[in-house]
Amino acid sequence: MAVFKGEVTALPPDKSISHRAALIGSLSEGVTEITNFSAGFDNQSTLGVLHDAGIEVSQHEIDGAYGRRIRKVIISSRGLWSFTAPEKPLMCNNSGSTMRMFAGILAAQPFESELVGDSSLMKRPMKRVADPLRQMGAGVDLSPAGTAPVRIRGTRDLTPLEYRLPVPSAQVKSLVTFAALHADGETRIIESIRSRNHTELMLGLETIDRPDGERVIVIPGRKTIVARSFYIPADPSAACFIVALGLLGSNSEIIIRDVCLNPTRVEFIPLLTGAGADITIENSRIIGGETIGDILVRSTRTLKPLVISNPTVVAGVIDELPMLSVLSAFSSGEFELHNAEELRTKESDRINAIVVNLERLGFDCEQYPDGFRVIGRRCRPVGQVTVACFDDHRIAMSFAVAARATGEGIALSDSDVVGVSFPNFFEIIENLKA
């Protein structure tokens, strides 16, 4: 077993906050400065569509903490209606976040536009994007299969509404919020199961917690958004891979600096500590409305099996489920997941991708429509096994962590895909080897 020790100070900036900071900047009057913006492919796609829709965007490197070079993005805008009709379809590449959230802004612009992506994104469902925007008065056309291209006939006359989220989705919540900022009146979004709340925090929106557990987000329409500065903390979803590496490694101790600790983003930590993981939070503080701190992880080779079925918990760890399932399988030999149909509509069908690869590695699995089970029996294969990445960065990194930590002969079909969210993933792992 490999040993990993050291300090991680170059974790990728948070993807979710980077997307939202850029989009909010495009709606703000004045100059928005975003420090420590993500260099990942997805976030660069957001900057690309903003530029192609007429927003002035620039980025350059500056000196950051711990002797690092970091990215600073500057966005200049005149406010809510600063966009111009694009001359060609807006390319979102592999970024579903870009396509879904930017659709909310384009719905309020007085021109026609089209959002497209790579072959993977063009297969992902977009009906949940179209439905609320149509209710608000925008024209939205999809393919016969309900996928991209997303063709939008925008209007300055969007109607405010009360919208109940049909599924817990921070992206849908955000796209409705961005559209509602342009509507003539107050929009209310109701969520029964909480999802990440960065958009509400960054816009300073009023939220109402009902006695029945539902939350209402109140969005006033046509209010001036004044440009401000944003600092992007380290991505907790990326931190989860390093946490798993430390837990699976032998006699390992890793500290991960300046991670976003927003409670809606780090629900994987109480799950793991409840299973016996040695994880500690240090140096917690508030910056720009977000909780930021350091994560200290020490080897915990044998964890209690993870069983995840509560819909609220599933929604809270949806991005971390590939890593959590692989970690639990290699640590305890067991894992069980239910109520996670959403995983089938990500960059890949992640339920199938995880099961296929675990079975290649000798695990006995059962697959369900909404999840799967690792049963606890393993016949370890002889020789090297190549796991399929399915063009999915989280699948690739989850099995890469298992390979590096256990020393087993596991190869990846496509390691370059990690650049979508974590360009320096392999470099960090190599630097942590003791």
Swiss-Prot record:
It is an enzyme of class 2 (transferase). Pathway: Metabolic intermediate biosynthesis; chorismate biosynthesis; chorismate from D-erythrose 4-phosphate and phosphoenolpyruvate: step 6/7. It is found in: Cytoplasm. 3-phosphoshikimate binds at residues 15-16, 20, 169, 171, 195, 319, 346. It comes from the Bacteria. Disulfide bonds: none annotated. One of its GO terms (molecular function) is 3-phosphoshikimate 1-carboxyvinyltransferase activity. CDD domains: EPSP_synthase. It catalyses: 3-phosphoshikimate + phosphoenolpyruvate = 5-O-(1-carboxyvinyl)-3-phosphoshikimate + phosphate. Signal peptide: none annotated. One of its GO terms (cellular component) is cytoplasm. The active site is at residue 319. Gene3D superfamilies: Enolpyruvate transferase domain. InterPro entries: Enolpyruvate_Tfrase_dom (IPR001986), Enolpyruvate_Tfrase_sf (IPR036968), EPSP_synthase (IPR006264), EPSP_synthase_CS (IPR023193), RNA3'P_cycl/enolpyr_Trfase_a/b (IPR013792). GO terms for biological process: amino acid biosynthetic process; aromatic amino acid family biosynthetic process; chorismate biosynthetic process. Keywords: Amino-acid biosynthesis, Aromatic amino acid biosynthesis, Cytoplasm, Transferase. Phosphoenolpyruvate binds at residues 15, 96, 124, 171, 350, 394. Its EC number is 2.5.1.19. Monomer. Belongs to the EPSP synthase family. HAMAP family: EPSP_synth (MF_00210). Catalyzes the transfer of the enolpyruvyl moiety of phosphoenolpyruvate (PEP) to the 5-hydroxyl of shikimate-3-phosphate (S3P) to produce enolpyruvyl shikimate-3-phosphate and inorganic phosphate. This is 3-phosphoshikimate 1-carboxyvinyltransferase. It comes from Chlorobium limicola (strain DSM 245 / NBRC 103803 / 6330). The lineage of its organism: Bacteria, Pseudomonadati, Chlorobiota, Chlorobiia, Chlorobiales.
